[in-house]
C-alpha cells in the first residue's frame, strides 16, 4: 500500500497500528516529510506520545485515532490521552488537515454496548454519559466509564459524525464491509459524509480493496487497510490508482511470462507465502525478491 515510489513528499501519510513501536513512523516522516500524518489506532506508546514523537513534531502535523488496545492498561491510556498532543485525536469530528477534510472514528464496535447491525434503539447505552449514569460510583474508573469501554463506539459518537457535514477522507480503526471482519456501518458513514477515501487499521493487513478485487472501481469510495509498521501515502502518484504502482518492471515481465493474461490477477491475489498479502503489496513495500523467486519457481515448473 505504500506510495514512496510515486511521490517524494506526500500531503498525508496514514500509519497502521504501531503497538508501541513508533520507529517506522519517525523514519518515514524524516525521509518523506509529509505535511501531516494520522496514526490509525492501537498506538500503545511506551512514553507520552509527544515524547516518543518529539523528533518529528516540528516536521509534520501529528493526528491520531485510538484503537481498542489503547485502553488495555493505564499506561496505554495515559500515554495517549494524557499526552500534550491529546487534542489531535480525530475521533468523532472532522478537521481540515493538509487541505483535506478528515473525519475520524476511533475505537471498535463492542456488541455489548452497540451492535450497529441492529437499530440504535436496541443499544445498551446511547452514549458514554448514559453508561456512566447507570454505573454505581464504585464501578467507575476515574469517575467515568470503565477504561475498556473508553475505546468502544457508542451510537452518539457515530451520529455526531453523521451530522458533521461533508468530508474528503474517513479514518477508522474498524474496517468497511468488504473486509471479512468489516462493518456496513463504516460504509454507510463514508457514503453519508461523501468521502472519496476510507483508511483503516486494526486488522494488520495492507489492503487495496479495489486492487485485490474486494471492491469495484465503481464503488463510492476507495478503501485501504494499513498494516502494523506500514503506511499509506496520499495522494497516490498515479491518478488512476493502477494496481501495478511501485512494482519493478522485471517483476511485471516475469508475471506476464508465467501467467500471460492472468498475470495481474495473480499479482493482486493474497498469497499464504507472503503472510496473506498480495504480491503487489509485498513488492511495493520493497520486498520484491521473494516475489521474484516465486515467479521464477513457477516458470520452472514449480507449484507456488
Predicted regions span which residues?
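Active-site neighborhood of phospho(di)ester-bond hydrolases with catalytic His/Asp-centered motifs
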Residues: 14-16, 37-42, 62-69, 89-91, ...
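A basic- and aromatic-enriched beta-loop-alpha substructure that forms the phosphate/nucleotide-
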Residues: 61-120
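Binuclear metal-dependent phosphoesterase catalytic core
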Residues: 2, 6-9, 24-27, 95-98, ...
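Acidic, histidine-bearing metal-coordination/catalytic regions of metal-dependent phosphoesterases
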Residues: 1-23, 98, 106-109, 121-127, ...
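Non-transmembrane "mature" sequence context
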Residues: 242-304
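N-terminal active-site segment of His-dependent metallophosphoesterases
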Residues: 1-58, 72, 163-166
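Active-site environment of divalent metal-dependent phosphoester hydrolases
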Residues: 19-25, 44-49, 68-76, 110-114, ...
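Active-site-proximal loop/helix segment associated with metal-binding centers of metalloenzymes
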Residues: 100-174
